[in-house]
Amino acid sequence: GGGDTSSKTDNGSKADNGSSDGAAKIEGSIVDDSYFGDEGTDSKPVTLKVWAPDAAVSLVKEQVEAFKKAYPKRKFKEISVVAQGEKDAATNMLNDATTAADVFSIPSDQLNKLVDAGVISQVAFKDAVTEANSEETVKAATLNDTLYAYPETNDNGYYLVYDKSVVSDEQAQTLEGILEACKKAGKKFIMNAGDGFYACTFAFTAGVKIDGLEKDGITQKFVKYDEDEAVKTLQAFAKLIKDYRGTFQSLDVANIASGFASGKCGAGIDGSWDTASNQKALGDNFGAAKLPTINVNGTDKQLISMFGYKYIGVNGSSKFPATAQILAHYLAGEECQLQRTEKLGWGPANKKVQESKAVTGSPVLKAIGEQSLNACVQVNIASTFWDPMANLGNKIIADTCDPSDAAAMKKLLNETISNVRDEG
């Protein structure tokens, strides 16, 4: 492979000329020039659009420049990199795939609908990708034995981030300790309880478990759970939040880093993607831990979260399908994953990068790794899951919520599950 930045490391796929990859050689994230076919020739210069989340745009632009240098024989007219939040990428793809990006980032739960709609291409370099990335990330992007997306991260989850000058490491272990420390210092604790991605923590901690989809492929399947215990747990959350009204604030996670910077926030539940801004705001006082416990009638229960992976997908309507695949493979390759870990703090799916110092020395990735053992994996999530969970969160934190009313809490829980299953 050409290009000095990109071909130094080999991700173990050197000998990869397996069935799905054709016979031409693939060296790490660089493939044989012949894969381009007639794309990138004088008569057919390449024009592509890439969607990346805001925080990653400038780095992805650099990576795209390195990609072009890696294939000096090919003509690239323009490869644009545009900011696009991952959670809305699939919706925008489904609205109009012809105007959407050729290469885009998505969270693991969005894959099903893109495959069902037939707008995402299967991965061209399956053997190389399977060998380079951790098994669970490959498995979560495989439907009916077909790999549909390039693993990008294994860290799409959230953790406790805290100001060590406000919350001690010991206090950080319990929700009660965190709220008390924040209250004492006159600071806020921020959790976006009105967003289903975070609010499902209330239900999961209460013992509610999901198990993929029913046979119809649409309806969320739930595992039987102890309703009394679940109600008591939701009551405990409601009471604690009521007791710390004014300290507990439900705001978008973007307010956590800005709150640290302005001195208004003491701790929050934030995602791995905000690592760099939180570290910058807190400096030496940056603290990271798995989510805390909550005391339910004398027993400390670990908060259970949502956890998933992020992927790079290729648009099935791309006018440059070969180049789009080659670029996706490059951006999801070892070097690019390592750069995103080092510069953005993202947790890699690539097995070699997982062993790098950037990962082993990261308190955030350690915290997220610990939390992933107490999490529901974000695959096969019904599209009807998020809004009822957001409603559950909003009801629990509402001023009108009465934590002592078990019957009302039971009704809310049953309605939430019924709405997730769309049984209205």
Language-model features, listed with the residues they occupy:
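Short, well-ordered beta-strand elements
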Residues: G28, D32, S43-A55, R74-V81, ...
